[in-house]
Amino acid sequence: AMYSDLQRYNELFDIYHHYDGVINLYDVNARAAAAPVQVSDELYAFLRWCKDTAYPAANGATNIAAGAVLRLWHDARESDSPAPPDADAIAAALAHIDIEDLVLDDAAQTVYFTDPEMALDVGAVGKGYAVEQTARAAQARGLTSALLNIGGNVRAIGTKPGGKPWTAGVENPWGDDPA
């Protein structure tokens, strides 16, 4: 069940592919500047959390509306001759990352962009959110002990069998100094 939960979030948060029967971020990015796009409960709750909780908590550092800039970097990486994006292109894209241009209508459960050049990219928060929601769903289904490690996002449920706490090691990215 956890695999299915994670797969569902992967499909919802995918900005590169459409999936039959799923309105995901690919669809939102393609259509939300033209008209409001109705999305699932799961995707709407996530977008609302991103805008109202994650964005202010990180002083804007987790801006899911930065897709226009992140697309430039993605395209540069995928190019036959990878190179950093042009500074003028980055400056132009930065004009289209205002989170306030992301309009979420709670009553209709729709997503709309007031800036036609806006695009969403949830890479900064999507995987962690998916892991947390998957862990909560597993607990609701009765799982009492697990250690999830999904691409570096670690989430413990309960304790190890036998009652000892879970431990997770984190490598110091600056070398051998344990600080």
Regions found by a protein language model. Give the residues of each.
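Mature catalytic core of soluble alpha/beta enzymes
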Residues: 1-179
